[in-house]
Amino acid sequence: MKTALVTGGAGLIGSHIVDGALAAGWDVRILDNLQRQTHREGKPDWVPGEAEFIQGDVRNRRTWERALDGIAVVFHQAAYGGYMPEIAKFIDSNGVGTALLLETIRDKNLPVRKVVVASSQAVYNEGAYRCPEH
């Protein structure tokens, strides 16, 4: 059986990827830090019991080593969505976390076949906004 890792798998987009991978017959492992700003009540009810769940930080190399064990495909959705005024936190979580993912695969010579890095809900923002020109 093929195993997919979905980082940020407890989040909005990641949870849909988890559902789709399970429906397609994949084994799924979720890596999510359950950041309090997003998950005030802890692990959400929509996280499926048949998916393995690791609570961890993408900025930790040991977390990556554990999460990537036996993985064929990574869907990398973990991201810190806020950026102002915490630009350093944004770069640390999103940039360094992704770099550690790729370094861990390379350094451990892991047989990961694909890494899918997609955008997040940040591209369409939150709430209703009006454009003065349209």
Regions found by a protein language model. Give the residues of each.
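N-terminal Rossmann-like NAD(P)+-binding domain of SDR-like oxidoreductases, especially those catalyzing
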Residues: M1-H134
